[in-house]
Amino acid sequence: MIKRVNKLVLGISFLFLIISIFAGCGTGKEAEIKKSFEKTLSMYPIKNLEDLYDKEGYRDDQFDKNDKGTWIVRSSMSIQSNGKDMNIKGMVLYMNRNTRTTNGYYYVDVIEREDKGIHRDNEKRYPVKMVDNKIIPTKEIKDEKIKKEIENFKFFVQYGDFKDLSKYKDGDISYNPEVPSYSAKYQLTNDDYNVKQLRKRYNIPTNKAPKLLLKGTGNLKGSSIGYKKIEFTFVEKKGENIYFSDGLHFNPSEDK
């Protein structure tokens, strides 16, 4: 009887040890993912995007020694309600630190319903440039609504704030060392500062609080190969998807 009890105690102790080890690994990987994102997110908000001309990101052997690098800034909102087509609006800027010039495009995309076949050839791009922190179309736009959307567009990096990234805890952590890829997902509330900022700027057709997804590929310690992006997912199900995507990347320049 005593031997059975001892075996049972030993088995339970071993089980707790295994659980503790896995929990510790998860906590450690979560801290690594946060640290990887903090290098970029700690810069938010950057109200004047031209300040990025004087900021350098992570450099590795992919950069030419004379290349100051290019910042790629992107933000987009995607909305699909009640099985309708998905509408996406966003902007991408390429900020060349060598020439201190910025070009990019505003885009509007419609992804048709599944029963009609999903494809992206409905995307329309409107080329833009940035001068004195103002985004200006480089070609004539007759659609006044689009012109206004470009004029009023703000990137999330200009108003988002992740100074208190450590407050997000107990995330759903995923890590694949083979790719490598990694992610951390957190349930937010509608009282979260960044959620309030998004609702202030976009007509988001749901009262559900979003989940914050920090997702990336490449070396966790830093790499110019791969990507990092953040996503606020309000709704994610068949026929209804509402999410906001943002990214700030530092890459080698195509023209040195």
From Swiss-Prot:
PROSITE patterns, from UniProt? PROKAR_LIPOPROTEIN
- InterPro entries referenced in this protein's UniProt entry, alphabetically: Csa, Csa_sf
Q: Which domain of life is it from?
A: Bacteria
Q: What is its main location?
A: membrane
- Provide the protein's localization: Cell membrane
Record's GO cellular component terms:
plasma membrane
Where a lipid (S-diacylglycerol cysteine) is covalently attached, the residues are C25
User: So which residues are the signal peptide here?
Assistant: 1-24
Could you list the residues that carry lipid attachment of the N-palmitoyl cysteine kind. Answer: C25
The protein's matches in Gene3D superfamilies, at most eight in alphabetical order, are given as: 2.50.20.40
Which keywords label this protein? Cell membrane, Lipoprotein, Membrane, Palmitate, Signal
The membrane topology term of the UniProt record is: Lipid-anchor
* Protein family (similarity comment): Belongs to the staphylococcal tandem lipoprotein family.
Name the record gives this protein: Uncharacterized lipoprotein SA0093
Species whose genome carries this gene: Staphylococcus aureus (strain N315)
